[in-house]
Each structure stands twice: as structure tokens, then as C-alpha cells.
């Protein structure tokens, strides 16, 4: 049973997240042969103050 975690900044619409889950599920099924009903996708949304690149939080820019 494949488990996929997608970490991204908050702000996407419910429609975007739904499409993401569907496309990730399809891609995992196509590449691994896993049945769609066995694929689990987690979305973890982060705020800009919990995400940093090159030593700087995105909220500080």
C-alpha cells in the first residue's frame, strides 16, 4: 500500500487539492501497478513562517 505525503504552502483551493490527489493517485498507480483503492495521499499544508529556504523564512521576505 503506497503512502504519499505532499508538503506545500497553504493557499490552494479545495478544487486544486482534489485535482492534486487524483493526479498523484493515478501517477502512483500507473508507475507502481498498485491498485487505486490501496493508495493513500496525505496533504500537509504549511504556513510561510514554518517554511524556510536558504536560512530565511518565507514570511520574512
Where in the sequence are the language-model features?
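A domain-level signal for the structural core that forms small-molecule/cofactor-binding pockets
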Residues: 2-61
